[in-house]
C-alpha cells in the first residue's frame, strides 16, 4: 500500500495522518517535505498519527528522528500518536522511544500542547 497523507490543522497544531508504508523513496521524501513546509511557515506544533502505517524501514525511522530534531531546532514540538505495535517495537529495540513524545490518541497529543503552554 502506497503512503497517503491527510493533513489538517486543529487549534494551531498541524496533524498528519499517515496510511501505508513509510519507506525509502518518495514516501519518506513526502513526509519530510510536509514537515519542512510546516516549519518554513512557522507552524511548529506537529502531530504524526501513525495508526495506519503498515510498514516502516530504517530510512522511515531516520526521517522520524530527523523531523523531531528539525522541529526542536525551530522551537517547536513534534509528537507521535497511535503507534502500531510494529513501530513501537522497532523504536523500543533501537532504544529510540525516549526520543519521541508518544500519545495513545490524537486527542491526548493535542491536549498535551495545551498543558505545556500553561
Locations of the language-model features?
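Short beta-strand/loop segment at the start of cytosolic alpha/beta domains
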Residues: 1-17
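Short, low-complexity, intrinsically disordered N-terminal segments
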Residues: 13-22, 117
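Amphipathic alpha-helical interaction surfaces in cytosolic regulatory modules
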Residues: 22-100
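Acidic phosphotransfer microenvironment of two-component signaling modules
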Residues: 85, 107-108
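Short acidic-hydrophobic, aromatic-tinged amphipathic segments that line or gate anion-handling sites
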Residues: 101-105
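Short, charged, intrinsically disordered terminal tails
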Residues: 110-118
